[in-house]
Design a protein with these regions (language model features):
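Short hydrophobic/aromatic beta-strand micro-patches
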Residues: 221, 331-333, 392-394
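PLP-dependent enzyme catalytic core of the Aspartate aminotransferase-like
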Residues: 100, 118-119, 127, 145, ...
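Short, solvent-exposed beta-strand edge segments and adjacent coil->beta transition regions
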Residues: 50, 267, 274, 325-329, ...
Length: 410
């Protein structure tokens, strides 16, 4: 069979015809449990010796179909679907980290990720080392034999900083650690994480995949590229499971125990979202670039940050890693916090909301919301400015959005 294009793979997969009734859409198996013909069959399923479903906190046919769809279009060795992006992050690091281990990352993180590292993991004896990931020497100074991972957001939110992934991958692998990346800002067809040395990818499927802001979800993609015999915590499993060692630990223990598996209803909705993701993204990203270019001309706007602008300091690296349209999120600075609030309050078309990559364009003031519980000192260390507005660009026309922005800036 000929290799299908990415666009075709979003709509058609080799296992589409597995349903006994030939449904064009994957049925929703809205069940908690499954019946077995014999006690022996039940034992085999619960011990993981067969592929039969035992309980929907562990696996479910609808969720499994969604996972296979993602696996097909990304080439990942395995995909685990959970109920949020934060569930994906916590499941990964409870799988990898142990007391005495450290994680090397940037302070430029989503607020809850930062809090998870700084507070939750610290309580388990895991050290988090913050450094400038755009500076290889600063990273090398932080990694050591106890580093269990280097973690980053491929385009930070809301700072829009970009680090060289191949360089970070080389540093991580040299120290026997995987490179883990949150790639939520750029979808699969724009950025192929494994080609840049990413071993484990995190995606908040709430965003581009869902599209309509109807459901929460998070994905863990394991590309099977890391040698887990180098991992202090997982090396004892490496001989048995090889490239699948991380996934084996995750699926057999952590994900079962934390109970954050995706629900079948969400998997169904997000499977539908996958089918239109490429079409939606093309419009969103093109409009985002137009807005960034036009915002630069407005006198009330002090600065515009979008890595697709040629004037952006990360433009060359961003283009190399993500192409000409690096996501549908931009930020811009106004004169003050008060000016930001006046702008937000005057918006008529653009919605005031916290989500990203909805079909609708959304505006937020990150310093007072996502980072509102942080101290001023913490916000400064994370480069979160009180003068910054973040826009997540939707499917409206650029002209309609510019009209709303212009009237709100008056």
């Amino acid at each position: 069979m000929n290799k299908n294009s990415f666009e075709a793979e979003l709509l058609h997969t080799p296992f589409d015809k597995e349903d006994a009734y030939h449904s064009l859409s994957m049925p929703v198996y809205n069940t908690a449990a499954y019946e077995f013909d014999t006690a022996e069959a039940m034992e085999e399923a619960f011990c993981g010796r067969t592929a039969d479903h035992a309980y929907s906190r562990i696996t479910n046919p609808t969720v499994q179909y969604f996972e296979k769809r993602i696996q097909t279009i990304t080439g990942a060795l395995s995909v685990t679907a959970l109920n949020s992006g934060m569930a994906a992050i916590s499941n990964i690091f409870f799988t990898l980290a142990q007391a005495g281990a450290n994680i090397v990352t940037s302070a430029h993180l989503f607020g809850n990720t930062y809090s998870f590292f700084k507070s939750t993991l610290a309580a388990f004896g895991v050290e988090v080392r913050f450094c400038d990931l755009t500076n290889p020497e600063a990273v090398r100074a932080q990694v050591d034999e106890n580093t269990c991972a280097i973690f980053l957001e491929v385009i930070t939110n809301p700072q829009l900083e970009v680090a060289d992934l191949k360089v970070l991958s080389g540093i991580a692998h040299q120290m026997g650690a995987p490179l883990i990346a949150d790639t939520t800002v750029v979808p699969f067809h724009i950025f192929h994480a494994n080609e840049f040395g990413v071993d484990i990818e995190i995606v908040s499927s709430t965003k581009y995949i869902s599209g309509g802001a109807t459901s929460l979800g998070g994905l863990i993609l394991d590309y099977g590229t890391f040698d887990w015999s180098n991992s202090k915590k997982l090396r004892s499993m490496a001989d048995q499971f090889g490239a699948s060692t991380f996934t084996a630990k995750l699926r057999k223990e952590i994900h079962r125990n934390l109970g954050a598996y995706m629900t079948p209803q969400v998997a169904y909705m997000q499977t539908l979202g996958i089918e239109t993701m490429e079409v939606r993204y093309a419009r969103q990203a093109a409009t985002c670039l137009q807005l960034a270019q036009r915002l630069q001309t407005l006198p009330q706007v002090e600065a515009v940050n979008y890595t697709g602008l040629e004037s952006n300091p990360f433009y060359q690296l961003s283009t190399k890693q993500f192409g000409a349209y690096p996501g549908a999120m931009l930020t811009f600075d106004l004169a003050s916090r008060e000016a930001c609030f006046r702008f937000m309050n005057r918006l008529q078309l653009i919605r005031r909301a916290t989500n990203l990559f909805d079909n609708k364009t959304l505006a937020i003031h990150p310093a007072s919301t996502i980072y509102g519980s942080f101290t001023e000192e913490q916000r400064q260390s994370m480069d979160v400015s009180p003068k910054t507005i973040r826009l997540s660009v939707g499917l409206e026309s650029a002209e309609d959005l510019l009209t709303d922005i212009s009237q709100a800036l008056v």
